[in-house]
Amino acid sequence: MLPAVSDATTPSAAATPARYQVVGIGNALVDVIAHAPDSFLAEHELVKGSMALIETGRAVHLYKALGSAVEMSGGSAANTMCGVASLGGRAAYIGKVSKDELGNVFGHDLHAVGVAFRPGAPSPETPTGRCIIVVTPDAQRTMNTYLGVSSLLCADDLDEAAIADGDVLYMEGYLFDRDDAKAAFRRAADVAHAAGRRVSLTLSDSFCVDRHRDDFRQLVRDSVDILFGNEDEMLALYEVESLDEAIEAVRRECPLVAVTAGADGSYVVTPDGTVRVAAEPVERVLDTTGAGDLYAAGFLFGLTTGESLADCARLGSIAAAEVISHVGPRPLVELRTLI
C-alpha cells in the first residue's frame, strides 16, 4: 500500500493559489556535451561519473581537447524547470548569468520553452558559467564545471515574490559550494514556508554531498519537505553502506524522499513506509545526463497536480526515460504527449 503523504508536504490551507507550480534555484550554466572514449577520461585525469569544479584555464583546455560538441543552456535545476514546462506545468527559474553571449543564450532558451527566468544582478567581471560533459560509451556522464558568475548567487539575487508564488521551491545542491549560496537557500526556504509553500532539495552529486555533508543534513532537517537523490548520494549523506540503511536514516529526517536507482527504478520514502516504482523501459540508453533532473520534473509535476506518490514516481520515470534515450539533458519531445 502506498504510504500517505506527510502533512509537511501539503501546502498550508492559508496559502494563496500559486502562479507557478515549481520555482527552481540553481547554477545557470551552458552545457557543452561531447562523446569520448574512456581513454579520454584517463588522459585528462577525469573520474568517471563525477562532477568536478574547474577554473578558467582547465575549462579552456578541456573544451579544446573535446573537439566537436553540442552546446545548449543547462544546469541541473534549469533542466528540471524545462521538464516541468514540457509536461505542461508552470515553472520559474532563478539563476545568475552575465551580460554576455552565453548569458543571452541561456535566458532566451528558458523563455523559448515557457520557463519564466528571474536572473540575479549580473557581474561585469565574471562570465556566464558552463559545464563540460563527457559522455562515455556506457552512457555515463562525467562533468567538469566552470561555475563563473552562477556561483556568485546570494540572497540579494532572489526574486522573493516569485518564490512566494510557487507551489514548490526546488533547490539545486550543486549551488552549495559557497557560503553565500547556502545563506540564499536558507532565505529562500524561509520565504517559501512563510507563504505556505513547500521546499524541495536535490542532492545533485555524491562528491558535493561529501564536501558539505553537515550543512546538507542541517538543511534537510530544518527546511526541506521533499528530498531528491540517487543511491550514491543517499549513501554519502548518511555515511552508510546499504540503501536500506540510508532509507531508514532519511525517513527520520525528511517527510518525503524520492531515491532514484537507475534501471532498478526509484523508491518513494515517507515516515509510513517505502514503495518501489519500476523504471520506464528504454530501448537504448544513449546519455544519462539530466536523468535525475527530469525525474524530479515529473515527480514534482505530479505532486503539484494532485497525483498519488506512486504516480508521481511514474511520471518521473517517464520523463527520465525520454531524456536518456538521446544526447542532452532536455527533452526532445513534449513530455505532455507521453503521459
Residue ranges and their predicted role:
Residues 1-94, 104-105:
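Glycine-rich phosphate/adenosyl-contacting loop at the front of the ribokinase-like
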Residues 2-23, 28-29, 42-48, 65, ...:
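Conserved phosphate-binding/catalytic region of the ribokinase-like
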Residues 17, 160-164, 220-221, 251:
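A short, aliphatic-rich alpha-helical micro-motif
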Residues 91, 117, 199-200, 257:
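Hydrophobic beta-strand scaffold residues
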Residues 109-126:
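A glycine-rich helix N-cap at a beta->alpha junction
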Residues 118-122, 133-179:
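Conserved phosphate-binding/catalytic loop of the ribokinase/pfkB sugar-kinase fold
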Residues 168-248, 264-266:
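Conserved beta-alpha-beta core of the PfkB/ribokinase-like small-molecule kinase fold
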